[in-house]
Regions:
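Conserved P-loop NTPase motor cores
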Residues: 35-56, 85, 93-188
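Residues immediately N-terminal to the Walker A/P-loop in ABC ATPase nucleotide-binding domains
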Residues: 32
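A short, well-structured beta->alpha microelement
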Residues: 18-27, 77-100, 105
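AAA+/P-loop NTPase substrate/partner-engagement loops
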Residues: 61-79, 90
């Protein structure tokens, strides 16, 4: 155990800096110069709440929202998003330069597995993968990314995100066990019993650690 807290909400900016989420100045990520999160779980598990908590640490950075969901999520009521129109015309023209022209930013791809238009879905997946691959210090600015999904095993849309995002956020006690084991096997944790936790954040590259409901723990 590295750190014990009463709840995830009590983890401070200083804690995040000490264990690698952000640097000591509070804005720039330590590892790889940017942050990338894959957040997966069923409806109502806490994906939006977790996303909002992460974004709230970076109040001065631009935030783009990519989603096909029309209803406004209450968890995002305090987040000022620039919502991107989910059309072929917009997504075909959108570049990484467009996203970073005003400075460092966040791109949130919310429930990407719900998009039914095959053309839009393909364009969005291409953009999402491009950001993960090339969004680090693009043109002098950085694109941080959060990808949320209902499924841990929708590899057609999220394979690249799963394999390349530095952080996974999972909700073990609300996730199908077989999906959870398949995901954890990728980092050698398939035998770990995480079922008692509501939410686990795993930093899946060096240094390997996870933030559970009550602890930050070295793996």
């Amino acid at each position: 155990m590295i750190l014990a807290v009463n709840s995830f909400d009590e983890i401070t900016r200083e804690d995040l800096a000490e264990y690698g989420l952000i640097n000591s100045r509070g804005l720039l990520p330590v590892y790889g110069e940017r942050l990338s999160f894959f957040i997966a779980g069923p409806p109502g598990c806490g994906k939006s709440v977790t996303t909002a908590q992460i974004l709230s640490l970076f109040p001065d950075q631009i935030k783009y929202l990519f989603t096909d969901i029309k209803e406004k999520d209450r968890a995002f009521q305090d987040i000022e998003f620039r919502r991107v129109r989910m059309t072929k015309e917009v997504l075909e023209k959108l570049t990484l330069d467009d996203l970073t022209k005003e400075g460092d930013c966040w791109c949130v791809f919310d429930d990407v597995d719900k998009i039914r238009n095959p053309t839009v879905s393909k364009l969005l997946t291409t953009l999402m993968d491009n950001i993960i691959a090339n969004g680090r210090s693009h043109g002098g600015n950085t694109i941080n990314i959060i990808v949320t999904s209902h499924s841990l095993s929708d590899y057609k849309r999220t394979k690249y995100s799963i394999e390349n995002c530095d952080y996974w956020v999972i909700f073990p006690n609300k996730t199908i066990k077989s999906q959870l084991i398949t995901l954890l096997k990728k980092i050698g944790l398939e035998k770990a019993d995480l079922s008692r936790y509501n939410r686990v954040i795993i930093h899946r590259s060096t240094p390997l650690f996870m933030i559970t409901d009550l602890f930050i723990t070295e793996i």
